[in-house]
Amino acid sequence: LYQNIATSNSRFFSYAEMIDASWKNATMFFDESQILIAKYLSYRNEEITKEDLKAFIHKFCKDKSRDILGIIGDELSSYSCSLLKEMEINLFRKMSRMHELELKKHILPDKDLRDNVETAIKSALYMNYRRMYNDEHIIQNHPQLHNALFLFIRNYAYSGMFRYSKKGDFNVPYGGIAYNNKLMRKKLDYYQSIPLIEHFKKSHIYNCDFEDFLRKTQPTENDF
């Protein structure tokens, strides 16, 4: 990641900007999909069953497949894309969980209802990118994309956690409602700013034993 930023790698920044744009696209997709809210209200009011809701979401994702894939665009969807599957899973899981909580506690206010459905959409997008980040083909053959995905995950993973499974896959879930309106635009602008680039030109990062580091760099009292 450091090397891509320090060298102003255009391919890396192109991928990072595509990913950031997709987050805004997901917001627009939610705004244009208010039928999801209406259908959940039908489920809440017992006008439809849980199986009816599941069937509706399946059909919704199938009918809207072009729009759903349009969230990430042609290039990103050409890789190991699981967005359609994740959208269906996350929408149904979130709505089912919302209904369970409403039965146990209280009816969600309209804003909370909207925020939760938007979170399901954003979680689906996050899960798609997490799967791409773990994809061995991308790791081995598309380092700039992999680093852009790393940057995204660092910004949107729950509590900024970084955790891997025994298989070596990153497995932290999406951060949730508080992350829905978060964008990387300011960071990307900063990472491409002249002062930062000039600073990086004079910087070196080492990953080694501290004793080896001291031998290699031979710091003086003026370095501290």
Locate each region found by the language model:
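SAM-dependent nucleic-acid methyltransferase catalytic core
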Residues: Y15-A16, K24-F224
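Conserved S-adenosyl-L-methionine
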Residues: L1-W23, M28
